[in-house]
Design a protein with these regions (language model features):
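A cross-family signal for N-terminal binding/gating loops and helix N-caps
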Residues: 1-190
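Basic, alpha-helical nucleic-acid-binding regions used in initiation and control of genome expression
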Residues: 188-232
Length: 232
């Protein structure tokens, strides 16, 4: 499919890109996974809503938070079930043995049901298929046209500080108030702050209550810091 080819081209461009461009390419890949692709496996349709990029290239992108599993190398378009940590499922996009690249499916819709990182593998395995069955599947990326509003932020609960400030998460902003994204609230604070400052600039006479209502409308919750942001 053309959209898988687009992903492949971006991945191929990643290796020789400068650092800032690498981050941009990883964001573009995440954006395309959310808006342009769905994953079809054994009758389960997975629609990504929040994905996090994990890339390891020893000389050009040494992200120690990447598991560096062999299943994150040269397995473009195949699933990787985590072998350690909290548990989870990634879609591998590496097309070479030279580097690891996969995207954690942190929040998804699976056959229309909202699932978090640890819920997704349980849901998949409840089909009666094994991890190996899922990981052996190929050609699981299919075209989608989701048209979400995509934003970026940092990754959640990193074990190591490297690339912790890099905006390597892509997420569907319009999904945030609809589903339970409490796991992401710490990482979303800066997004909320930036949105609120822009809102106040466009509505200079808005009250604190109006700002709180707007935050809730867009993000589904109101950080405690809203009062500080409004009155400073």
């Amino acid at each position: 499919m053309d959209r898988a080819a687009d992903l492949w081209t971006l991945v191929s461009n990643l290796k020789n890109a400068a650092h800032d461009e690498q981050v941009h390419i990883l964001q573009m890949l995440g954006d395309k996974l959310i808006n342009d692709c769905r994953i079809e496996v054994f009758g389960v349709t997975i629609e990504p809503l929040w994905v996090e990029a994990y890339c390891y290239d020893e000389t050009r992108f040494p992200d120690q938070n990447t598991h560096r599993s062999s299943k994150q190398k040269n397995r473009f378009g195949q699933l990787y079930f985590h072998e350690r940590g909290y548990g989870g499922v990634d879609i591998c996009l590496s097309n070479s043995e030279d580097f690891c690249l996969s995207f954690l499916l942190k929040a998804t819709l699976a056959n229309g049901h909202f699932l978090t990182q640890t819920q997704l593998p349980r849901a998949l395995l409840s089909t009666g298929k094994t991890k190996a069955d899922f990981e052996h599947l190929e050609d699981i990326l299919h075209p989608a046209n989701a048209r979400h509003t995509i934003c970026h932020t940092t990754r959640v609960n990193l074990a190591k500080p490297c690339y912790s400030d890099a905006p390597l998460t892509s997420f569907a902003l319009d999904a945030i108030p609809k589903y339970d994204f409490r796991f992401a609230r710490k990482n979303l604070r800066e997004n909320v702050r930036a949105y609120l400052l822009a809102y106040m600039a466009a509505h200079p006479d808005c009250t604190e209550q109006e700002c709180r209502a707007e935050c809730f409308r867009v993000f589904g919750w109101v950080p405690d810091l809203v009062r500080t942001w409004v009155h400073n």
